[in-house]
Amino acid sequence: MKKLKINYLFIGILTLLLAAALWPSIPWFGKTENHVAAIQARGVLRVSTIDSPLTYAVVNGKKYGLDYELAQQFANYLGVKLKITVRQNISQLFDDLDNGNADLLAAGLVYDSARVKKYQPGPMYYSVSQQLVYRVGQYRPRSLATVTENQLTIAPGHVVVNDLQRLKETKFPDLSWKVDDKKGSTTLLEDVINGKLDYTIADSVAISLFQRVHPELAVALDVTDEQPVTWFSRLDDDNTLSAALLDFFNSINEDGSLARIEEKYLGHGDDFDYVDTRSFLRAVDNVLPELEALFKKYAKEIDWRLLAAISYQESHWDPQATSPTGVRGLMMLTKNTAQSLGLTDRTDAEQSISGGARYLEDMMAKVPETVPEDERIWFALAAYNMGYAHMLDARALTVKTKGNPDSWTDVKQRLPLLSQKPYYSKLTYGYARGHEAYAYVENIRKYQISLVGYLQEKEKQEAEAMKLAQDYPAASPEELNKAPFPFISFLSQSSGYLTHSPSLLFTPQKKEEK
């Protein structure tokens, strides 16, 4: 899979071009008959999106998503409320613009020459490639030359259809595919995972997130190069909304808000490891149930699933784990640390988890208050791994190299330098295995994503099974004699539960959220 690339130079050039085009519309607050004025008069910014872990999702009643958070900030910027409408596929999104039911589309949509003829793009803020996926264990196509419509299905409105058409005309005359008008990209990915479909095409970020919960999903080949992602609005003579978007994105880029949100949703990396992910999910099924209550009991300052992910990174949930340097137990505590925490047995699961949680809380309390709340945990984890003093060195080095010491994105890039003599020789606390601390934090983030998604998926499956049981409750022999059991209906409804359903990070939401 291609490395995700956030090209700020490219974004800057496009933003300048957009600014030149929109210059007559700025300042936009002064106009009365314009899109921004209409939104402010209504008091609501209407945004249409699709349900995905990157764009918009509701988990345990809380809303998440890169596009959701940006849309909420933009609504605040305009001084209005945000109204999110979730659609099934991309075609329905553009229908909302055409029918006047949405002001903006914020759904990880790719900038495309065909789209910009009909719709107004906004600033570009990250990029993806389109990739063809298949299920591990099935035939992997090495080229599009032999792919047929019986194998490849695309969601309606998908930008890749234009690319496929060009490839068919120029390179692969036998290439064919079909479009399923009733399914979105998320559902088609599920179909590939469940063996109902040979291939589909999705963007690289969506695929990497799916793989954290479904390691059996594999990338066969890249269909496109990197493509910038943007929001879309209606294309007409009034550019006030586009001008407002430009001003908004410039402001969050300058104050670091954009980088923090991108780090939150895109910073987990894309170096997917099938074997490691599969082993982790097996441990979730077989080992975690014995430890779950302890993680929940002692995770006071953080989500218990994050504490569990830390423990897996430390010991693979082995209470007897011991390293060559002498650290031991589920949280791999040193003897000195254990003594300072009042622990008597590092291999005791409860003592280790309680001690590790308290030690992490101490690290979080030491993180400077200037660090944003949602990034403090990553600084604390780096300190947990390599020591608080070396984390201070990493911040100091970030300042010396013109970075922001309060930005995890900037600081983590300097961590590997702590093991290089030209850098550590000039730092207060000297040499540190900064590259290990970098990998440590990144691995924990990946395990956390997998754990959250996998557990939510299991909860969904249990809820669906309970509903099925309620629809078809157990009957007495006398009742069975009165009427035959509706096997056909039962099988048709239960077939979807025989394999893994999608993660709740990908669970379809209500059609409209206010």
From Swiss-Prot:
Subcellular location: Cell outer membrane
The reaction(s) this protein catalyses: Exolytic cleavage of the (1->4)-beta-glycosidic linkage between N-acetylmuramic acid (MurNAc) and N-acetylglucosamine (GlcNAc) residues in peptidoglycan, from either the reducing or the non-reducing ends of the peptidoglycan chains, with concomitant formation of a 1,6-anhydrobond in the MurNAc residue
Membrane topology listed for this record: Peripheral membrane protein
GO CC terms of this entry: cell outer membrane
Signal peptide extent: 1-30
UniProt GO BP: cell wall macromolecule catabolic process; cell wall organization; peptidoglycan catabolic process
This enzyme's EC code(s): 4.2.2.n1
Region (LT domain): 270-514
Gene3D superfamilies cross-referenced by the UniProt entry: 1.10.530.10, Periplasmic binding protein-like II
Catalytic site positions: 314
Catalytic EC class: lyase
Family annotation (SMART domains): PBPb (SM00062)
Keywords assigned by UniProt, alphabetized: Cell outer membrane, Cell wall biogenesis/degradation, Lyase, Membrane, Signal
Chain residue ranges for the region called Non-LT domain: 31-269
GO molecular function, one term: peptidoglycan lytic transglycosylase activity
SUPFAM superfamilies found in the cross-reference section: Lysozyme-like, Periplasmic binding protein-like II
UniProt remark on domains: The N-terminal domain does not have lytic activity and probably modulates enzymatic activity. The C-terminal domain is the catalytic active domain.
Primary role: Murein-degrading enzyme that degrades murein glycan strands and insoluble, high-molecular weight murein sacculi, with the concomitant formation of a 1,6-anhydromuramoyl product. Lytic transglycosylases (LTs) play an integral role in the metabolism of the peptidoglycan (PG) sacculus. Their lytic action creates space within the PG sacculus to allow for its expansion as well as for the insertion of various structures such as secretion systems and flagella.
Family, similarity comment: In the N-terminal section; belongs to the bacterial solute-binding protein 3 family.
Protein's name in the database: Membrane-bound lytic murein transglycosylase F
Organism: Salmonella arizonae (strain ATCC BAA-731 / CDC346-86 / RSK2980)
Gene: mltF
